[in-house]
Amino acid sequence: MSSVKLIVGLGNPGGQYEQTRHNAGFWFVEDVARQYNVQFRPETKFLGEAARIQSNGLDVWLLKPMTFMNRSGQSIQAIAKFYKIAPEEILVVHDELDLDPGVARLKTSGGHGGHNGLRDTIAALGTKDFKRLRLGIGHPGDRNQVVDYVLKAPSKTDRALIDDAIYDATRVLPDLLNDDMARAMNELHTKT
């Protein structure tokens, strides 16, 4: 395994999407930036907003692609290529329909599961072998309602549960940054 050098929060740019379920990945990296007291800055060469934190004397990049969800891979590929970050050193944080609000799960690899941001990331990186943090948002129950569901804000109760899961996930971030995925998974999966 490799320690994480790039943390990408998936979401859609623009105020109209800011509070939607599909932006749970943005919420996570924004929370990490607050904890490390850093600001996101527009980075046109990366098609997104980026911030840098330090872990064990090494740079770790935070990225919010500003390409819209279905083109997230372009932004991820641009920053990874520029800083020579391998796919296995990337953590992609995204909303997950198949998990209830309040649940967060780590994975070391996998398919896209119908998530367009992951689909584009896999295509852009040429591999599915990158780490993921899946933030549960619940499912509307009918697959025909998924698009409307992810592009709406969660209820106050669900948002509080998602925020709790984000908090729990940020607590295991030091393990991820120290290349201890097994410990991070164990801690997180027993909490949420």
From Swiss-Prot:
According to UniProt, where does the site described as Discriminates between blocked and unblocked aminoacyl-tRNA lie?
N12
One annotated GO biological process: protein quality control for misfolded or incompletely synthesized proteins
Please verify whether the record's keywords include Cytoplasm: yes
Q: Which reaction does it catalyse?
A: an N-acyl-L-alpha-aminoacyl-tRNA + H2O = an N-acyl-L-amino acid + a tRNA + H(+)
Site positions for Stabilizes the basic form of H active site to accept a proton: D95
Which GO molecular function annotations are given, in alphabetical order? peptidyl-tRNA hydrolase activity; tRNA binding
- Tell me yes or no: is Cytoplasm among this UniProt entry's keywords: yes
Q: Where does tRNA bind?
A: Y17, F68, N70, N116
Q: Active-site positions, per UniProt?
A: H22
Main location per the UniProt record: cytoplasm
Q: What class of enzyme is it?
A: hydrolase
Provide the assembly information: Monomer.
What does the function comment of this entry state?
Hydrolyzes ribosome-free peptidyl-tRNAs (with 1 or more amino acids incorporated), which drop off the ribosome during protein synthesis, or as a result of ribosome stalling.
List the protein's name: Peptidyl-tRNA hydrolase
